Amino acid sequence: MNELEAPKKMIFLAAAVSDFTCKSKTSKIDSSEDFSSIELEKVPKLISALTDIWAPTVSIFSFKLETDEEKIVKKAQKYFSQGVAGVIGNELLTRRYKVILILKDKTEEISIKEKDDSEIETVLVQKLLNL
């Protein structure tokens, strides 16, 4: 790295876990009572706040998990208007060994062999560092 270059800074927004939270209760759940469900509520979307206010100089990547690639690419487009650098999409059944890197100007599949000892995240981060 050139000594005048600043190191790359990236934020990754994990899918699903950042979409919902447990609905707040006003009292403790009594352990003697039976219950069979937990209510979830949507959390506010914070991508615009990250890109505009908190971390405007950082490359922000959002994850999108879907059941088919066409949905991933279509849904990814809305994130670019919110200032993200890219969207990392994965399909439910292939998520451990294949991702789709969606940038404003290109879409690229990144994959490893299913039985490979490496992890897709390692390959993905190396790819992003080389952008």
Regions found by a protein language model. Give the residues of each.
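Small-residue (G/A/S/T)-rich helix-start motifs and N-terminal tracts that mark the onset
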Residues: 1-6, 84, 91-131
